[in-house]
């Protein structure tokens, strides 16, 4: 029984295997049929595409051939037309050449006729000249010279008459225009008249204050005069102290310092130094403000800070009794008006006029007119001013040659401002120049820190560097300065030379 079961199972397996093999072969046959069908279809598609491509190519070639044939026909037609036009042009040119040849022949014939006529005229002219020479007794060249000389003489005479007349008219017109411009300019400005004095007075609450100003053994007044460089004159004038100083800045410094000390009531050397320091700062602020104010009033832009400060210092300066800053401002206004009348650049002229006396605002420059122009020009050049402005500053006293019309206008404006009645006083300026010269002589020696000409120029008080100048050198320095003053200056009486050498040692107890 088991054998039969196993035999049945085995037979089943074999039968299944055979069925599977048979089915597999059937599948392979179907697959081969499909592949054969696909191959045939692909070949048919490829053949169709090949035929289509060939047909398209033939069609495209046919189109291109037809297009080329049309282009060739068009080109041939163009060439034929061009040949026709060229033939027409050749025919036209031939006709023109023929016409020109005929015209040239006529011209040549006319030229020959003219040459024959000209020859005949020359022969007649030569015959006439010979007859005239025989009649007048002059050759042709002699007659030509006589005629030329006569015409030349008459031309020169007429030209000279015209030139003289033109010069006279131009001179009259120039004088009239110049007068009109100057009158118009001077009528359009309004100037302030100001005079500077070398003395100032400070009112005191009572005469006892004079003793406090002098101090014990005169230490307070010595400290004031040493720090400020001005004469403090205490005399019998009731309730007043007189300050004498040729330098307006130092005079103002002394006046304000004394007023503040009198108001405060504390007067001793330490307090004096403190007040002098504070007042110096105030005056420096005033200098800056005045410089900025005049620049703003004149609408001038781009000035260097050093130039603005120099203008501010001119507020305290005077020349021949005329305030230098007011003079510079007045000159700038006049120069601007003149520049507009003369069709020049008014901005450049106004700038140069304002800065023309800037050299007087430098501490190391003398107040005389010689030297400050060149020094001011050098300062303006170092501050970046233009060459026209620099030359106008340097040339306003003719120390150098003016190189532009603007420089001439600056000279004219300066002269107008300085020459108006009451503008200047010669005596005051000479006095200031003499005191300045005293200080300049002292500053020329090594070791001099500060120098003040006081007592109306009868004394020079000099503060020296205690490191560079010892006691022995102080004696020699005073003698050398006195000898140089004797050699270079003319003055009545005597001038006292005082050397001050001070050593300060400061230490703090903590």
Curated annotation (Swiss-Prot):
Its main location: membrane. It is found in: Cell membrane. GO terms for biological process: mRNA catabolic process. SUPFAM superfamilies: Eukaryotic type KH-domain (KH-domain type I), HD-domain/PDEase-like. Residues 198-258 form the KH domain. Gene3D superfamilies: 3.30.310.210, Hypothetical protein af1432. Its EC number is 3.1.-.-. Pfam families: HD (PF01966), KH_1 (PF00013), RNase_Y_N (PF12072). The chain crosses the membrane at residues 2-22. The keyword Transmembrane applies. It is a single-pass membrane protein. PROSITE patterns: HD, KH_TYPE_1. Residues 324-419 form the HD domain. Keywords: Cell membrane, Endonuclease, Hydrolase, Membrane, Nuclease, RNA-binding, Transmembrane, Transmembrane helix. It is an enzyme of class 3 (hydrolase). GO terms for cellular component: plasma membrane. The keyword Cytoplasm does not apply. GO terms for molecular function: RNA binding; RNA endonuclease activity. Endoribonuclease that initiates mRNA decay. Belongs to the RNase Y family. This is Ribonuclease Y. It comes from Borrelia garinii subsp. bavariensis (strain ATCC BAA-2496 / DSM 23469 / PBi) (Borreliella bavariensis).
């Amino acid at each position: 029984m088991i054998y039969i079961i196993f035999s049945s199972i085995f037979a089943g397996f074999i039968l299944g295997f055979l069925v599977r093999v048979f089915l597999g072969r059937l599948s392979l046959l179907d697959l081969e049929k499909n592949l054969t069908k696909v191959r045939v279809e692909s070949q048919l598609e490829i053949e169709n595409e090949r035929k289509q491509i060939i047909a398209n190519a033939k069609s495209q070639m046919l189109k291109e051939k037809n297009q080329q044939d049309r282009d060739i026909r068009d080109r041939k037609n163009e060439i034929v037309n061009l040949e026709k036009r060229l033939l027409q042009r050749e025919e036209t040119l031939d006709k023109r050449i023929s016409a020109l040849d005929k015209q040239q022949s006529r011209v040549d014939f006319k030229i020959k006729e003219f040459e024959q006529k000209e020859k005949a005229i020359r022969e007649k002219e030569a015959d006439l000249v010979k007859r005239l020479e025989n009649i007048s007794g002059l050759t042709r060249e002699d007659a030509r010279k006589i005629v030329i000389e006569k015409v030349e003489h008459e031309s020169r005479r007429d030209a000279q008459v015209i030139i003289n007349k033109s010069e006279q008219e131009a001179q009259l017109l120039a004088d009239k225009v110049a007068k009109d411009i100057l009158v118009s300019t001077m009528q359009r400005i309004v100037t302030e008249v100001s005079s500077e004095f070398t003395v100032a007075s400070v009112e005191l609450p009572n005469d006892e204050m004079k003793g406090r100003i002098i101090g014990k053994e005169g230490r307070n007044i010595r400290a004031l005069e040493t720090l400020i460089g001005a004469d403090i004159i205490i005399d019998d004038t009731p309730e007043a102290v007189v300050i004498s100083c040729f330098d307006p800045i130092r005079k103002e410094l002394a006046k304000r310092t004394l007023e503040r000390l009198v108001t405060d009531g504390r007067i001793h050397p330490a307090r004096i130094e403190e007040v002098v320091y504070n007042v110096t700062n105030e005056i420096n602020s005033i200098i800056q403000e005045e410089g900025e104010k005049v620049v703003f009033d004149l609408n001038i832009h781009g000035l260097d800070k050093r130039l603005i400060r120099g203008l501010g210092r001119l507020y305290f300066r005077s020349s021949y009794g005329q305030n230098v800053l007011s003079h510079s401002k007045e000159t700038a206004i006049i120069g601007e008006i003149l520049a507009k009348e003369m069709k020049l650049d008014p901005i450049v002229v106004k700038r140069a006029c304002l800065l023309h006396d800037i050299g007087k605002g430098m501490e190391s420059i003398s107040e005389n007119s010689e030297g400050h122009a060149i020094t001011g020009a050098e300062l303006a050049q170092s501050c970046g001013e233009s060459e026209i402005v620099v030359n106008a500053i340097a040339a306003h006293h003719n120390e150098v040659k003016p190189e532009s019309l603007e420089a001439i206008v600056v000279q004219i404006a300066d002269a107008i401002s300085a020459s108006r009645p009451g503008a200047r006083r010669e005596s005051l300026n000479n006095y200031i120049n003499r005191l300045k010269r005293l200080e300049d002589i002292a500053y020329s020696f090594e070791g001099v820190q500060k120098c003040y000409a006081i007592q109306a120029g009868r004394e020079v008080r000099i503060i020296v560097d205690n490191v560079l100048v010892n006691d022995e050198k102080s004696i020699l320095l005073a003698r050398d300065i006195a000898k140089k003053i004797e050699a270079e200056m003319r003055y009545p009486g005597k001038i006292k030379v005082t050397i001050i050498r001070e050593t300060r040692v400061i230490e703090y107890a903590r």
